[in-house]
Design a protein with these regions (language model features):
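Active-site/ligand-binding-proximal alpha/beta "capping" segment
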Residues: 61-112
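RNA substrate-binding interface of SAM-dependent RNA methyltransferases
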Residues: 1-68
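Structured adenosyl-cofactor binding patch, chiefly the S-adenosyl-L-methionine
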Residues: 8-9, 19-22, 27-35, 94-129
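Short flexible/disordered coil segments
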Residues: 57, 77-85, 122-129
Length: 129
């Protein structure tokens, strides 16, 4: 669902790490074919890849359910910014988070977190604002 949304919003690409096979029929169905239209790369070492992007001038954020992280609505994003969305079970690893500026989606209700697809959608929308 994140890939489907990314492609629909015109996101430039995706860097995937520890994901299912993108050509798995269920994944292709969930993306509504977006995986065939969205440029992507597989990362073997996400923390190292993030370091490379940062050395090339990219700003890299990580979405975390942490009130001390920067409120996503207060960030002025640029077209070359990157945001890491962790998986629903473990979130963003400490090694990866150490390379990123943490951001959060402030929630008014009692939910502790959002699922990855919903969080990813909100993050992408805010980054394009």
């Amino acid at each position: 669902a994140i890939v489907r949304t990314a492609e629909a919003l015109g996101i430039n690409g995706a860097l995937l790490h520890n994901c299912c096979d993108v050509y798995n029929p269920k994944a292709l169905r969930a993306s509504m074919g977006g995986m065939l239209r969205l440029p992507f790369m597989q990362s073997e070492n996400l923390a190292e890849d993030i370091k490379k992007y940062k050395s090339q001038g990219f700003s890299v954020y990580a979405a975390v359910p942490d009130a001390s992280a920067q409120d996503i609505t207060k960030i002025e994003f640029h077209g070359s910014d990157i945001c890491v969305i962790g998986n629903e079970g473990n979130g963003v690893s400490g090694e990866v988070l150490a390379e990123c500026a943490p951001l959060t989606i402030n929630m008014l209700g009692r939910a502790e977190s959002l699922n990855a697809s919903v969080a990813g959608t909100i993050v992408m929308w805010e980054m394009l604002r």
